[in-house]
Design a protein with these regions (language model features):
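Short, basic amphipathic alpha-helical segments that act as recognition/interaction helices
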Residues: 18-40, 73-95
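NAD(P)-dependent Rossmann-like dehydrogenase/reductase catalytic/cofactor-binding core
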Residues: 413-477
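Short Lys/Arg-rich basic patches
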Residues: 1-3, 10-13, 34-56, 69
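Active-site-lining helix/loop region of Rossmann-like oxidoreductase modules
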Residues: 118, 160, 171, 182-185, ...
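Rossmann-fold NAD(P)-binding glycine/threonine-rich loop
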Residues: 244-260, 268-289
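Surface-exposed, Lys/Arg-rich phosphate-binding patches that contact polyanionic backbones
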Residues: 2-22, 58-77, 81
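N-terminal glycine-/serine-/threonine-rich beta1-alpha1-beta2 phosphate-ribose binding loop
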Residues: 101-254, 342-347, 383, 392
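Rossmann-fold dehydrogenase core element
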Residues: 282-295, 316, 320
Length: 477
């Protein structure tokens, strides 16, 4: 919603001593001849975001959708136009007219990338901060951790958040700009985030809270909110999955909601969705793309380990044994004390490392995985890597390395690239698992390429599908 219109609606709300939802929906009801009963609920304080979620009767939703189909526009544009005319404010000039996928009926925003977040933890905090921090960066500026400030015609500042879902009392019901700092989040602050106008909705718990994590967080009361409805009403393009490690059932449940809403997905955690043929087919059938699984960091333990393995390989040293031990103090490491939740994470990291050499390594000779939770490290992670190899003359050659990072900011830029790559795919009708982007950005993609080849594939994907240049035929490589 344009800021001017949002301010006018807020003023009208104050003058009528009502709430924003009732007034806006009442205006729409009068326009479409649909009776509307006031809810009496208080409105969320308007924030800096242009996103306003309206709760309205099903009959009014149907009328809006029918009018949108007839007018070949979006329900969002119809709402903005109706409110602007009623309140005497100049409305939206541009329309959201580009479709996505294989004609699945969703109409996409042309100039923005509308993003919803599942799991408002440290990673979500760093993502929201990152968009705020770099929203005004120059298009040709070098920004650490991003492939491009302007990626295929989408600037970092073109990302706008539309919805967020969590299950804890400290976050549900709060503005996203506040919730990212709520307990137990403990990452570093590098940007001042204003109120967003996005209220964190009550998500589905399933297996999202582990045995150890349940001792430090409290589940929010009440029913799970209508995830599909919220994603549709907000015109969300891309959903980012930041659920805790081990949330197998919760991830699959949310994936179904994403598919039903007709959104793209960036799966940042190690539950295998993008790499599984079943889910790849489901995303193709829905006409939407997915990038996954298990986000890489900018320079983290996995990419550093892969580089060391590649150096040994390229210089003719056989890797006989290797390990990677990780320590951290965030909620993810606390969750991973429950070893049963580690299976997919361990598989993901091990797969990423083993794929760098052209020979099989026995399971006993490779150990990769989280090791312990150290509370005072907070969102910092320490990783210890050791390689033992055999060089010329069967002489031993060993290497050790320690890396210290702030865990969540280390992947935020990678997620920003993934979001925009998904948007390019949506714009160009590309669906299913995106091979090149998944290989470059994720630890467990459908197909693993070496890092240089994967980056080349992503650059080719951007070149072919960019909206700022003449495009070659669309490709999902």
């Amino acid at each position: 919603m344009p800021p001017r219109l949002k301010r006018r609606l807020a003023l009208e709300t104050a003058q009528r001593h009502g709430n924003m939802n009732d007034i806006a929906v009442g205006i729409l009801g009068e326009r479409y001849g649909v009776p509307v009963e006031p809810t009496g609920r208080r409105s969320t304080t308007p924030g800096a975001s242009g996103v306003v979620v309206l709760r309205m009767p099903e009959a009014l939703k149907r009328s809006l959708k029918a009018d949108a189909r007839k007018s070949k526009t979006t329900t969002n544009d119809l709402i903005v136009r109706a409110l602007a005319e009623s309140l005497g404010v100049e409305g939206r000039k541009e329309t959201m007219a580009s479709t996505n996928g294989k004609g699945n009926g969703r109409v996409r925003s042309g100039d923005k990338v509308r993003v919803a977040i599942i799991g408002v933890g440290n990673c979500a905090c760093s993502l929201v901060q990152g968009v705020e921090y770099y929203k005004d960066a120059k298009a040709d500026e070098f920004v650490p951790g991003l492939m491009h400030v302007d990626l295929g015609g989408y600037h970092v500042g073109d990302i706008e958040f539309t919805a967020a879902f969590d299950v804890t009392t400290d976050k549900v019901g709060k503005d996203l700009g506040e919730a990212i700092w709520a307990h137990p989040n403990n990452t570093i602050k590098f940007a001042d985030v204003p109120k967003t106008g996005i209220t964190v909705s009550r998500g589905m718990t399933h297996d999202g809270i582990g045995l150890y994590l349940q001792d430090v967080v409290e589940k929010a009361p009440g029913q799970t909110d209508d995830v599909v409805g919220i994603l549709k009403e907000t015109g969300t393009d891309v959903v980012v999955n930041f659920l805790p490690v081990g949330s197998e059932e919760a991830t699959k449940w949310y994936t179904e909601q994403v598919l039903n809403a007709g959104c793209a997905m960036v799966n940042c955690m190690p539950v295998f969705i993008a790499r599984e043929k079943y889910w790849d087919n489901r995303f193709q059938q829905a006409g939407v793309p997915i990038i996954g699984d298990d986000i890489k960091s900018q320079v983290g333990a996995t990419i550093t380990h892969r580089v060391l393995m590649s150096i040994f390989r390229d210089r003719g040293v056989r890797v006989d044994r290797t390990f990677q031990l990780n320590f951290g103090g965030n909620a993810d490491f606390l969750n991973m004390l429950e070893r049963e939740r580690l299976e997919s994470k361990k598989i993901s990291k091990t797969y990423s490392i083993k794929s760098t050499v052209p020979y099989e390594m026995a399971d006993k000779n490779i150990h990769v995985g989280p090791s312990d939770h150290v509370p005072w490290l907070e969102d910092r992670k320490w990783a210890y890597i050791r390689l033992e190899g055999t060089a010329f003359g069967d002489v031993p050659l060993n290497a050790e390395l320690k890396i210290e990072v702030w865990d969540s900011p280390n992947s935020a830029g990678v997620v920003i690239d993934g979001i925009r790559l998904c948007k390019l795919a949506l714009d160009n009708g590309i669906s299913g698992s995106l091979g090149g982007p998944s290989s470059y950005l994720m630890k467990s993609p459908p197909k693993q390429y070496n890092d240089d080849a994967a980056r080349d594939l992503v650059e080719e994907f951007i070149r072919k599908n960019a909206r700022t240049k003449k495009k070659e035929p669309a490709s999902k490589a």
